[in-house]
Curated annotation (Swiss-Prot):
GO cellular component terms given for this protein: granular component; nucleolus; nucleoplasm; nucleus
Keywords: Acetylation, Isopeptide bond, Nucleus, Phosphoprotein, RNA-binding, Ubl conjugation
Keyword Ubl conjugation: yes
GO biological process: DNA damage response; negative regulation of cell growth; positive regulation of cell growth; positive regulation of signal transduction; regulation of protein stability
Annotated family: Belongs to the CARF family.
Claim: Ubl conjugation is one of the keywords in the record: yes
Subcellular location: Nucleus, Nucleoplasm
UniProt superkingdom: Eukaryota
Pfam families the UniProt entry points to: XTBD (PF11952)
N-acetylalanine modification, residue list: A2
Biased composition range(s): Basic and acidic residues: 147-162, 224-233
The species this protein was found in: Rattus norvegicus (Rat)
Post-translational modification, as annotated: May be ubiquitinated.
Protein name: CDKN2A-interacting protein
Amino acid sequence: MAQEVSEYLSQNPRVAAWVETLRCEGETDKHWRHRREFLLRNAGDLVPATEETADAESGARSRQLQQLVSFSMAWANHVFLGCRYPQKVMDKILSMAEGIKVTDAPIHTTRDELVAKVKKRGISSSNEGVEEPSKKRSIEGKNNSSVERDHGKKSAKTDRSAQQENSSGSKGSSTKSESSGTSARSNSGVSHQNSSTSEGDRSVCSQSSSNSSQVTSAGSGKASEPEAPDKHGSASFVSSLLKSSLNSHVTKSTDSRQHSGSPRKNALEGSSVSVSQSSSEIEVPLLGSSGSSEVELPLLSCKSSSETASSGLTTKASSEANISSSVSKNSSSSGTSLLMPKSSSTNTSLLTSQVAASLLASKSSSQSSGSVASKSTSLGSMSQLASKSSSQSSTSQLPSKSTSQSSESSVKFTCRKLTNEDIKQKQPFFNRLYKTVAWKLVAVGGFSPNVNHGELLNAAIEALKATLDVFFVPLKELADLPQNKSSQESIVCELRCKSVYLGTGCGKSKENAKAVASREALKLFLKKKVVVKICKRKYRGNEIEDLVLLDEESRPVNLPPALKHPQELL
């Protein structure tokens, strides 16, 4: 058929010239050969008979010609490109192209053909039979999750109620045991005090030591108990017991004043009051009562004990009884001073002042009274020295802690020696950076002063997903800088990447300094190869090791000083 068309055009050159005017620009010979046949088959009366008629075409004729050209192009697109058009257009162009044989047209499979093939094979499409099972599964999953949540809530509630019952039971048992323990302790203390009145001086000393040991054990035992409300309850219970014991001691002291019979009884009563004083002074702070009770209760007990002591001294008694009572008082006060450094100084001052007053009023022997005063003052001075030493030790511990903290904060990094392993880790990155910088320089026309060196270097490093580290330091802070730098160059800039030194620059501003440093760094990439080496640099007057980027031929001589310690940046 193609031969027939070519023969026809050779016989009618006028028609051939007219058809050539309908060819599109850039249309291939194969497409044009088949589309030309389509035009000639359906042209009919549109082919001009003479040149005059071709020039004087009417409007209807031109519209028909444009429609024919459009149909021919649609048919060519459908045959060679696989384009699809509305059904009316497809029917029209296929009917117009009957009889045209296209042997070398490509094969295009449409969507309908693919769906038909899939259905023939028995494979269901992705949209069929999927929605209902998925809905059912989602509903079943929701129901199962809701049931599991209900079971979890019920089990959590039962666990919480069981824990609360156990905790309440343990709290009740602990409070009961504590109250029984405190009542037993108070009863034992009262029985010991009653028995002490009928015994001698040795029994009094043993009683005071046993009471102090019992109090310390009780204090340690209660300090280990973790519950705060039980502590407050026991403290209030003990404070009420202490008030009742104080009232009983006051009545006993008044009775002793009225019935001042034998010196033996007065001494024993004074020793019993001192024992109660030591027990009250020790129990109050250990059981966790308030600070006011710590101060007020010892003062009251001191007054009662000093009054009994003065009454015992004013009576004409033997010196041995006075000495024994004073020794028992001083021993009890020393025990309290070791456990209570706060109230010891006030107790000793009251004792010394009242003993001095009793010495002026009494007619007893000066040696015994002097021994009492000297013992009390020595004990007071010892307690003060102990408190001072403890305070000094505590204050010495505080600055040592602060200095250790400051030293730990100042040392942020540990210096380690650089090895060849560090070079092996860094070298592959700079080999890739060398190629990237080379391509960037080619893109901007090579290395020249007109190029923004800082932006070019930063872009090359960011292309490899790394960052350019920039550090600025005023020139005044660098003592290792060469002396040929002028005073106007007041800013120093250092460039690093991957903890490797690239270059240093000085300038009037930060931008100028960074530009100079970037230019010096880019000069390294103009050589044949860049190498990471371990070199020595100066940092605050000391030589340190640093990773430096150099070209293969150069040797590190007079490197600029480091602005920051390299180990800090690793």
